[in-house]
Amino acid sequence: MSPAEASREENVYMAKLAEQAERYEEMVEFMEKVAKTTDVGELTVEERNLLSVAYKNVIGARRASWRIISSIEQKEESRGNEAYVASIKEYRSRIETELSKICDGILKLLDSHLVPSATAAESKVFYLKMKGDYHRYLAEFKSGAERKEAAENTLVAYKSAQDIALADLPTTHPIRLGLALNFSVFYYEILNSPDRACNLAKQAFDDAIAELDTLGEESYKDSTLIMQLLRDNLTLWTSDNAEDGGDEIKEAAKPEGEGH
């Protein structure tokens, strides 16, 4: 085993260790080292999933914080507590700085290493979907021209992923389904296009249902889970009380159908 291979193996092991300890920032660092190894070529499915899980947890914690703080900010604004609102805005902007930094980190890695080195259709869709996801996370909190740019970048990445997925991946493939799930969430939440969101989600669900009997045992669980999430969102979006925003919109959470 060459020194590079040994160090790659060690970083993967350390990333798994960090995951067990729920130290996701360090998990990101270990997996970035693996991804940046010059002669690495394409990441294995396991490595790709570890990288995805690491970033998912790091960004997920901040996204949850941002939503909570934004909700409190709205309540205080409606009560007219201007002094509190100013403090909340400042605190929210600190979280937004962290969110921007995390998104910029993975987007740079995707552009410099992961997307260019991807050869298999599955890998290309996985990374382009990931690229769309992190641009979408930027669009969630940016405003004005920055939000417009983030939304445009999201659309381009998801469309590129979709073109490959429709041509080369089975309708029941967890990554293809995860892409449809997150792409539809983007249409609904960021572009405010409920019709397009519903059409995309329904098409993906119906196409997969038609081919369900061809599913292998290993991906059956992943695929049916994402199909359930597609259906949950469709139910939420088409119901009369969709406007109340009481229920949480579902996104792909597992790396095989990665996203969220």
From Swiss-Prot:
GO cellular component: cytoplasm; nucleus
Summary of subunit composition and partner proteins: May form a complex with the transcriptional activator VP1 and the bZIP transcription factor EMBP1.
Protein name (Swiss-Prot/TrEMBL): 14-3-3-like protein GF14-F
Keywords linked to the UniProt accession: Cytoplasm, Nucleus
Bilayer-spanning residue ranges: none
Induction, as annotated: By wounding, drought and salt stresses, benzothiadiazole (BTH), ethephon, methyl jasmonate (MeJa), hydrogen peroxide, abscisic acid (ABA) and incompatible and compatible races of rice blast fungus (M.grisea).
Ranges where the record places region Disordered: 241-260
Tissue-wise expression: Expressed in seedlings, roots and panicles and at lower levels in flag leaves and internodes.
The keyword Plastid is assigned to this record: no
Gene name of this polypeptide: GF14F
Its biological purpose: Is associated with a DNA binding complex that binds to the G box, a well-characterized cis-acting DNA regulatory element found in plant genes.
GO-annotated biological processes: protein localization; signal transduction
Comp. bias (Basic and acidic residues): 247-260
UniProt cross-references to SUPFAM superfamilies, sorted A to Z: 14-3-3 protein
Protein family according to the UniProt entry: Belongs to the 14-3-3 family.
Alphabetized Pfam families for the sequence: 14-3-3 (PF00244)
Localization terms from the record: Cytoplasm; Nucleus
Database matches in PROSITE patterns: 1433_1, 1433_2
Coiled coil: none
